Regions:
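A structural signal for short, hydrophobic/glycine-enriched beta-strand patches
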Residues: 1-160
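A transmembrane-helix-recognition feature enriched in membrane-embedded lipid enzymes
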Residues: 166-188
Length: 189
């Protein structure tokens, strides 16, 4: 169970829950398997009505810089009736490091401010560690869980699911190690 503070100064929602290419191709919002980043953020936006809100997510593609997650997320939030004028949509970042850095530059958090970061559970450590390295303490709000709290070893013959989990896990471990070696974080665990 996630225990949240009564008041926070800001929410940082990491991109990665939309598919900008398909959204543009079919002229409708296209969400992916990390949609919980958007869905759960709605609850926090409604709970913390005075908080600053930054959605961070650019393109990640050098060839298609206008295919950014922030633009599609803004459309999503508008469609469900949230006031997007009170939100900041950062659309230049291309990776988690830039998500946190650019958001910090926008937020300009004071020392005692409380900020919550919303991202997938498998991705949370990287976001938190980048914040730590840049003197920004973030409270984690993990979503998009792929495993139960209590690990139970059992034979699972669902090959596609197993490959997907292995890909996600290896991607994050490589990312944690690479960011540590590049000096973007101070630790990997």
């Amino acid at each position: 169970e996630i225990i949240l503070p009564d008041e926070v100064d800001g929410l940082m929602i990491l991109g990665g829950a939309t598919n900008p290419f398909l959204s543009d191709e079919f002229n409708q919002i296209n969400l992916n398997g990390s949609v919980e980043r958007l869905v759960e953020s709605i609850t926090l936006i409604k709970k913390y009505t005075e908080a600053k809100i930054i959605f961070t997510g650019g393109s990640g593609s050098i060839k298609k810089p206008k295919m950014d997650h922030a633009r599609i997320a803004k459309q999503f939030f508008m469609q469900i009736g949230l006031d997007t004028d009170k939100m900041i949509f950062e659309n230049k970042s291309r990776n988690t490091y830039e998500n946190v850095l650019y958001s910090k530059n926008i937020a300009k958090p004071k020392k005692n401010e409380k900020w919550i970061v919303i991202t997938s559970a498998f991705h949370m450590n990287r976001a938190i560690f980048i914040g730590e390295k840049n003197n920004w303490t973030l409270t984690p709000y993990a979503v998009d869980f792929t495993q139960p709290k209590k690990f139970i070893f059992k034979l699972n013959l669902n090959l596609l699911n197993n490959l997907n989990l292995m890909q996600r896990g290896s991607h994050e471990w490589i990312g944690l190690m690479a960011y540590y070696l590049m000096g973007r974080t101070s630790r990997i665990l």
